Amino acid sequence: MARAKKVDDNQKEIVQTFRDLGARVRVTSSEGNGFPDLVVQYRSPMNRRLQTLLVEVKDGSKPPSRRKLTPEQEKFHAEFICYIVESVKDVYELLEINYCD
């Protein structure tokens, strides 16, 4: 049975960062059953290739024990390529954009 999915405190900031960088974002955190929090579509300025990314948001300010994947998420990640993003810097790295603090 699917559990109610908690939304990480930094998800709004992560979503806004993706959008500010030109990505389309669909928030899917309510899907449950291990499905990632975000579906992100982004066209790389380097090669103009359109990419669709499955992204799990974890709050990097929490201790590692609070950032672990649930068993359902682990199963989903074993079947599909998913990316874990814990910070704005991670968004830049995932999209291969230079991050300036």
Regions found by a protein language model. Give the residues of each.
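Catalytic phosphate/metal-binding cores of nucleic-acid and nucleotide-processing enzymes, i.e., regions
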Residues: M1-D101
